[in-house]
């Protein structure tokens, strides 16, 4: 049984890179723990905002709608990334790739219509929550 030395060398160099990278991270964490100070006081536990002493409560509470909009943005941003990757390789994918991208776009449009229908993108609180899904 012959062993391909080129493949072994490639894997060996990759695993050496991973080992030394993790070792360097571990070394820096241990060094900061050894050399770092361990004093704690009332002022060390207060938030620091560019040298300005904070006045009042520094905890900010956001509405859940902000997080919903952020999640919707991430979903449709990932869609744009997938469609960009498809558009780069459009010659290689042919009609099958086009039909897959079309089905992907249609499913995301249906998801967007669903979000509009359940009023997930509605910011006004005056509208009653009478949601009819079908």
Swiss-Prot record:
It catalyses: a quinone + NADH + 5 H(+)(in) = a quinol + NAD(+) + 4 H(+)(out). The keyword Transmembrane helix applies. It is a multi-pass membrane protein. InterPro entries: NAD(P)H_OxRDtase_bac/plastid, NADH_UbQ/plastoQ_OxRdtase_su3, NDAH_ubi_oxred_su3_sf. GO terms for molecular function: NADH dehydrogenase (ubiquinone) activity; NADH:ubiquinone reductase (non-electrogenic) activity; quinone binding. It is found in: Cell membrane. It holds the Pfam family Oxidored_q4. Keywords: Cell membrane, Membrane, NAD, Quinone, Translocase, Transmembrane, Transmembrane helix, Transport, Ubiquinone. It is an enzyme of class 7 (translocase). Its EC number is 7.1.1.-. NDH-1 shuttles electrons from NADH, via FMN and iron-sulfur (Fe-S) centers, to quinones in the respiratory chain. The immediate electron acceptor for the enzyme in this species is believed to be ubiquinone. Couples the redox reaction to proton translocation (for every two electrons transferred, four hydrogen ions are translocated across the cytoplasmic membrane), and thus conserves the redox energy in a proton gradient. NDH-1 is composed of 13 different subunits. Subunits NuoA, H, J, K, L, M, N constitute the membrane sector of the complex. Belongs to the complex I subunit 3 family. This is NADH-quinone oxidoreductase subunit A.
């Amino acid at each position: 049984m012959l062993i391909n030395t080129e493949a072994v060398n490639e894997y060996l160099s990759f695993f050496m890179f991973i080992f030394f990278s993790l070792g360097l991270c571990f070394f820096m964490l241990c060094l900061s723990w050894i050399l770092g100070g361990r004093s704690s006081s009332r002022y060390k536990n207060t938030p620091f905002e560019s040298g300005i002493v904070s006045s009042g409560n520094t905890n900010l509470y956001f509405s859940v709608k902000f997080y919903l909009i952020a999640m919707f943005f991430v979903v449709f941003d990932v869609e744009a990334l997938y469609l960009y990757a498809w558009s780069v390789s459009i010659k290689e994918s042919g009609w099958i790739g086009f039909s897959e991208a079309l089905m992907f776009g249609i499913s995301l449009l249906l998801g967007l219509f669903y979000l509009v229908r359940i009023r997930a993108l509605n910011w006004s609180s005056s509208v009653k929550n009478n949601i009819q899904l079908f």
